[in-house]
Amino acid sequence: MNINLTLIGQSIAFAIFVWFCVKYVWPPITAAMEARQKKIADGLSAADRASLDLELAQEKATKELQKAKEEAAALIDQANKRAAQIVEASKEDARKEGEKLIEQARAEIQQERVQARDALRAEVATLAVAGAEKILETSVDAKAHSEMLEKLAAEL
């Protein structure tokens, strides 16, 4: 066996093997690698988009939370103001009612005072008439007259 012929035969076999690999084996492998590479690139871009979306969502949530806090603070402030107004209105109503009751009591006292004065006048007039009758019935004795006046004064 000649070594040169062996080398040429092996070279031809190797060339056929390379051609076979390039023609039939290499295209599916490169296609699979390209598909895998595309899939990885798509996954990375989706991860980047998701990361960006997450940041945007977090910013939006932070803004919404801040807005909700501000609205809650405004509502609490408004409720406190309304409560203060209600308390002030209640105080004013109570003060007016108290003044009204005081005025009614004063009017009642004045009315009772007038009635008592009228009753006292009537009683004094009755006593004066009774005293005058007793004085006129008895003799015009100075001693008896002074005793009657003392009794009349005691009754008043």
Swiss-Prot record:
GO CC annotation: plasma membrane; proton-transporting ATP synthase complex
Ranges annotated as spanning the membrane: 12-32
Membrane topology of this protein: Single-pass membrane protein
GO molecular function, one term: proton-transporting ATP synthase activity, rotational mechanism
Main location: membrane
Keywords: ATP synthesis, Cell inner membrane, Cell membrane, CF(0), Hydrogen ion transport, Ion transport, Membrane, Transmembrane, Transmembrane helix, Transport
Cellular localization per UniProt: Cell inner membrane
CDD domains, alphabetized: ATP-synt_Fo_b
Annotated S-S bridges: none
Assembly behavior: F-type ATPases have 2 components, F(1) - the catalytic core - and F(0) - the membrane proton channel. F(1) has five subunits: alpha(3), beta(3), gamma(1), delta(1), epsilon(1). F(0) has three main subunits: a(1), b(2) and c(10-14). The alpha and beta chains form an alternating ring which encloses part of the gamma chain. F(1) is attached to F(0) by a central stalk formed by the gamma and epsilon chains, while a peripheral stalk is formed by the delta and b chains.
Family: Belongs to the ATPase B chain family.
NCBIfam families in UniProt: ATP_synt_b, PRK05759.1-2, PRK05759.1-4
Protein task: F(1)F(0) ATP synthase produces ATP from ADP in the presence of a proton or sodium gradient. F-type ATPases consist of two structural domains, F(1) containing the extramembraneous catalytic core and F(0) containing the membrane proton channel, linked together by a central stalk and a peripheral stalk. During catalysis, ATP synthesis in the catalytic domain of F(1) is coupled via a rotary mechanism of the central stalk subunits to proton translocation.
Protein name (Swiss-Prot/TrEMBL): ATP synthase subunit b
Organism: Marinobacter nauticus (strain ATCC 700491 / DSM 11845 / VT8) (Marinobacter aquaeolei)
